[in-house]
């Protein structure tokens, strides 16, 4: 008609081009409105930069919350395990005393004072002696002498050993065949002291024995009251 091709209403509404066609039953304004709507739909089909930044920020916050919660759970679990181990070793020490009329004791345990020593690296000798006497493994080589009595069975993760020969943070040489000390759940050495057995009442805490974990803390020299409040201990 009049030299122009005609298009259907659907074709006219879908096109976004200017054509020299006659669109039967479709107004120009209707075509324009339909084209603008299609453009807006295409424009908002993807995330904007601001939206991406917001999403990344939310993910980062959630990841931080998960990590902090996991860290708290691990620390709480370690404290609970240390409390259980200290209670179990204390019971073993009572059994040892019943047989030997004294708690596990030597010059190393008599010389360690929980009041003045907050560095677990200083606990090694006393801790090793405690292991030898409670386990019966007096050579600390996993081969107790024949007839040796064991008062406590130490789990592998409680022992200062290593699958390969290495040096720990305290400078101790760890091997797979020898025990260097009793390890707490935080990776440090358990403290064990019998200093009040020497007759002093101004050092140490218990007249029997002191057994403790610094709960992951390392305090050079004398620990503060705040430090000791975080320890897991038998006093």
What are these regions (language model features)?
Residues 1-47:
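N-terminal leader/signal peptides at the extreme start of proteins
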Residues 5, 14-15, 33, 50-53, ...:
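Compositionally biased amphipathic helical and low-complexity segments enriched in hydrophobic
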Residues 36-39, 71, 75:
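Sec-dependent, cleavable N-terminal signal peptides
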Residues 44-73, 82:
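N-terminal single-pass transmembrane signal-anchor helix
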Residues 60, 76, 121:
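Charge-dense, low-complexity intrinsically disordered segments
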Residues 79-235:
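N-terminal pilin/flagellin-like segments and related low-complexity appendage regions
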């Amino acid at each position: 008609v009049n030299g122009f091709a005609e298009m259907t209403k659907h074709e006219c509404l879908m096109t976004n081009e200017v054509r020299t066609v006659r669109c039967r039953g479709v107004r120009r304004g209707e075509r324009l409105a339909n084209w603008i709507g299609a453009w807006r739909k295409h424009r908002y089909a993807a995330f904007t930069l601001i939206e991406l930044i917001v999403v990344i920020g939310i993910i980062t916050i959630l990841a931080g919350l998960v990590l902090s919660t996991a860290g708290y759970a691990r620390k709480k679990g370690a404290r609970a395990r240390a409390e259980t181990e200290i209670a179990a070793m204390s019971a073993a020490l009572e059994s040892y005393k019943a047989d030997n009329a004294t708690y596990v004791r030597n010059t190393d345990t008599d010389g360690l004072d929980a009041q003045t020593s907050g560095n677990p690296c200083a606990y090694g000798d006393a801790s090793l002696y405690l292991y030898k006497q409670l386990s019966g493994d007096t050579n600390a080589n996993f081969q107790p002498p024949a007839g040796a009595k064991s008062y406590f069975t130490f789990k592998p993760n409680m022992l200062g050993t290593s699958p390969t020969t290495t040096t720990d943070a305290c400078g101790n040489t760890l091997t797979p065949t020898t025990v260097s000390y009793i390890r707490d759940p935080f990776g440090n050495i358990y403290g064990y002291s019998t200093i009040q057995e020497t007759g002093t009442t101004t050092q140490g805490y218990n007249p029997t024995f002191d057994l403790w974990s610094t709960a992951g803390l390392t305090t050079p020299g004398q620990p503060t009251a705040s430090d000791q409040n975080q320890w897991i201990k038998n006093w």
